[in-house]
Amino acid sequence: MSDFIFTSESVTEGHPDKICDQISDAVLDALLTEDPESRVACETVVNTGLCLLTGEITSKAKVDYIKLVRNVIKEIGYEGYRAGGFDANSCAVLVALDEQSPDISQGVNEADDVNDDLEDNTGAGDQGIMFGYACDETPELMPLPISLAHRLAIQLSKVRHENMLNYLLPDGKTQVSIDYKNGVPLSINTILISTQHNPEIDGITNEEEIRQRIKEDLWKNVVLPATEDLEIKPNIQTTRFLVNPTGKFVVGGPQGDAGLTGRKIIVDTYGGYARHGGGAFSGKDPTKVDRSAAYAARYVAKSIVKAKLAKKAEVQLSYAIGVAKPISILVETFDTGVISQANLTELINKYFDLRPAAIIKEFDLRNLPQKMGGTFFRKTASYGHFGRRDLDLPWEKVEEKAAQLAEASKVFL
């Protein structure tokens, strides 16, 4: 199918599930900042007036979890009259954390395929499959639908934080549908923005008048600024623009919906444009291959596309708990590759070390929170873990690897 419409969504940091992702990753940041060897699997639940921290943590760090949770919620914007029914200062915070299972710890500490190589001594923290993807649709080598959905969500949040539209509240979602012709993005078919807001705007109380006001404001202050540097831009005449289709969005955040860590895994990755192994990222330390190997898979896929060895590349990795080396490596280029997939796999095996300890070392994952002033992983917990133009992410820096692949591939051409 070469002509189609593809749709992806994003959410703001005030979405209930994203509140949870940020809290879980803020816990991870705090623990790794004090103790880079911390083992963390932190889950968060939010509901009306309640935040629950649970999971397994083994660490020498001392963290005031209740204070941390309240600070994250406050920074997102849920405080006082702008809280929308969920207040950082008054919500109950419950902490129910255990230590990591010794059975899991044993597998990570001493791999089944152990030898004299230090990187072989750290096994994967669990079994699983991870996918990485890249394509040439955007400068950051991401699919256009998810890239644009994130741009809109980021701008929506910026407008709220800067009080440009003082009636906006923290919860919000964006969705973008792109027209493809011969498999290439052609135009923006539909933009959908749902944003929480005050029940009254500048004295306006009529539901339809409020929705029309928000629609006009968002087109001017969110859609146009978010797309001004794109080759494919929205057109007020041809792009369908939907805002709060139910009519109003006053009740939102945890008051409107319960939130849970790890429920926005498609938003976190490629917007459904590529496959997903099912594992979430937030609240997990780097020994969890759900996170670290997914970063590595993106690193490999982006290096392939950056090297112009394919227009699209999807990399699957699989691991067994307690085993360092991947069980399998698969690359798919969707008939866009300039060399065979077998040759690409050969290059991957030669130029990328995909054992957990090697990935952690390559990206310095254990030390990044400390180096970044105590906050690193939390910043990835909203607006995607890949293709971020606003963050300095080591798995996005592929120039050196791409150059190696481009040179090495010449023997296959």
Curated annotation (Swiss-Prot):
Keywords: ATP-binding, Cytoplasm, Magnesium, Metal-binding, Nucleotide-binding, One-carbon metabolism, Potassium, Transferase. InterPro entries: ADOMET_SYNTHASE_CS (IPR022631), S-AdoMet_synt_C (IPR022630), S-AdoMet_synt_central (IPR022629), S-AdoMet_synt_N (IPR022628), S-AdoMet_synthetase (IPR002133), S-AdoMet_synthetase_sfam (IPR022636). ATP binds at H15, D171, G172, K173, K248, F249, D257, R263, K264, A280, K284. The keyword ATP-binding applies. Pathway: Amino-acid biosynthesis; S-adenosyl-L-methionine biosynthesis; S-adenosyl-L-methionine from L-methionine: step 1/1. It catalyses: L-methionine + ATP + H2O = S-adenosyl-L-methionine + phosphate + diphosphate. It comes from the Bacteria. Binds 2 divalent ions per subunit. GO terms for molecular function: ATP binding; magnesium ion binding; methionine adenosyltransferase activity. K(+) binds at E43. Belongs to the AdoMet synthase family. This is S-adenosylmethionine synthase. It comes from Prochlorococcus marinus (strain AS9601).
